[in-house]
From Swiss-Prot:
It comes from Listeria innocua serovar 6a (strain ATCC BAA-680 / CLIP 11262). GO terms for molecular function: RNA binding; tRNA (5-carboxymethylaminomethyluridine(34)-2'-O)-methyltransferase activity; tRNA (cytidine(34)-2'-O)-methyltransferase activity. GO terms for cellular component: cytoplasm. Could methylate the ribose at the nucleotide 34 wobble position in tRNA. Pfam families: SpoU_methylase. One of its GO terms (biological process) is wobble position ribose methylation. It is found in: Cytoplasm. This is Putative tRNA (cytidine(34)-2'-O)-methyltransferase. SUPFAM superfamilies: alpha/beta knot (SSF75217). It comes from the Bacteria.
Amino acid sequence: MPNHIVLYQPEIPANTGNISRTCAGTDTYLHLIRPLGFSTDDKMLKRAGLDYWDNVKLSYYDSLDEFFEKNAGGEFYYITKFGRHVYSDVDYSDPNKNYFFVFGKETTGLPDELLQANEENCLRIPMTDHIRSLNLSNTAAVLAYEALRQQSFGALLQEPNYDRKIFKD
């Protein structure tokens, strides 16, 4: 079963574009919950995602309720600096589960009510107190690759796939 990145009302097109590229490169599904803080025609969104958009498994939703209704049965983790558990302490290794990593708006995060109702599934990435938060696209990549690492990288190519040879065999 696949891994999923869920963006709740993302505001910065470059972040969403970068995340889409990570999703294309890791075979991770991308879910966007409206309203978005930008147009999907935004040049920053397109530039950050480069020409990989055709390889992104992308779904849109008009609300959190619609998202949860259409993805019932998944295992949901809410990524927040307030999480009581560290992301790397969770087991994502079961290939038969759908793991959903839910991220909030860049400026305000996820709704407090959602976090309070799911306290045990709220995860954080350790950081210093010198910053308010980590960048959304970097955080999404950390979670995507941690899940894939635990799944032995699934179907990803684990050998270089380029014609260019740098190292001697």
